[in-house]
Amino acid sequence: MIPPATIYLIPTFLDEDALTVLPEYITQAVKTCDVFFVENERSARRFLKKLWKEMEIDRYDWFVIHKSEESTKTEFLHQVKQGKQIGILSEAGCPGIADPGQLLVAAAHQAGAIVKPLVGPSSILLALMASGMNGQQFQFNGYLPV
């Protein structure tokens, strides 16, 4: 019997100078991954190479997450059914928070995978902390248009 897949929600930095604030166990989780689902492949590869300098980037399978592509979800579930160790990375901050990775996390739960969120920066949480607003009663309605 194939053991259940583990999905690591790998945070990325919001500022390139902030690499040192990420805990070491994030690097350890990256080292266990077989495949990565990312919002942007180029920036994810760069980030992971900075995090783990010895990483052989081309040894891994990479899939780009698109909000509405059923093919990405289908490939993700295929990897989950094989019991793979999967890393999900967003462009900046924590995957699954106002991020297309949320769709894969929901699919992972439905498929019985183990989902492990890793501690990291979140622009939403940082904005709430700096606002002085009541953290018990706030609502996030999306990012401002760029």
Task: Outline where the language-model segments fall.
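Glycine-rich, flexible N-terminal cofactor/catalytic loop recognition
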Residues: 1-65
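General beta-strand structural signal in soluble alpha/beta enzymes
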Residues: 38-39, 90, 115-120
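Alpha-helix capping/helix-boundary segments
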Residues: 42-44, 93-94, 123
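Conserved helicase motor
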Residues: 63-70, 143-145
